[in-house]
A protein has these predicted regions:
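Conserved catalytic core of Hanks-type protein kinase domains
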Residues: 40, 63-64, 127-130
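Short, contiguous alpha-helical
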Residues: 2-10, 24-28, 32-35, 45-96, ...
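Acidic/histidine-rich alpha-helical segments that form the ligand environment
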Residues: 93-136, 152-156
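Hydrophobic alpha-helical core bundles mediating ligand binding, dimerization, or RNAP-core interactions
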Residues: 27, 31-34, 38, 117, ...
Length: 177
């Protein structure tokens, strides 16, 4: 994580081009806030489902990691992660957050989820160091939509903030074990 040294100021992270550095600072601040919220959760809290359509906090955390993987493939490698069998095997279930996620993403301690999130984020950060701001603004077609690399990575923290709100809501309502 990027230390804030008692400051809550978004500035370009060192070692990156200016705009990528701001993106990295934003991604990392978002992640730090998520980790602070979940770092002490029990397996009961991570696995709790309110109903048969619900997604547990553990599944949401794996979903956050899966977004890094998906956008690494699109923006760094120019391919869909669902076209890579080894990535499908590991990340399709958390990416989709459906019945298989409710059944399969269970029973893990928080350290498991945090390690998964950290591993994929470390790869994201290493890859972002290899690119410049021109790459960040590169536009491509995603079906009928024009999208740039910045938007993909913006969506990573946008989605994380949304799911963190969902996690907060859940934590205020999960009954004690």
């Amino acid at each position: 994580m990027i230390p804030n040294n008692g400051k809550l100021i978004i500035t370009p992270a060192e070692g990156y081009t200016p705009h990528i550095g701001v993106l990295v600072s934003t991604l990392q601040r978002c992640r730090e806030t998520t980790i602070a919220l979940v770092k002490d959760l029990s397996i009961h809290q991570l696995d709790y489902l309110f109903d048969e359509q619900d997604n547990a906090i553990g599944a949401l955390l794996m979903h956050l990691a899966s977004l890094d993987v998906a956008f690494q493939e699109i923006t760094f490698r120019g391919r869909n992660c669902m076209d890579v069998p080894e990535l499908v095997a590991k990340w399709e279930v958390p990416m989709n957050l459906d019945a298989p996620a409710r059944q399969q993403i269970r029973g893990n301690p928080i350290k498991y989820y945090l390690a998964e999130m950290e591993a994929v984020r470390a790869d994201t950060l290493a890859q972002l160091k290899q690119h410049d701001d021109v790459w960040l603004w590169h536009e491509q077609s995603d079906g009928d939509t024009l999208i740039n690399n910045y938007y993909y990575w913006y969506h990573v923290y946008e989605d994380e903030i949304n799911h963190r709100g969902e996690i907060n809501w859940r934590l205020s309502r999960i009954p004690a074990a």
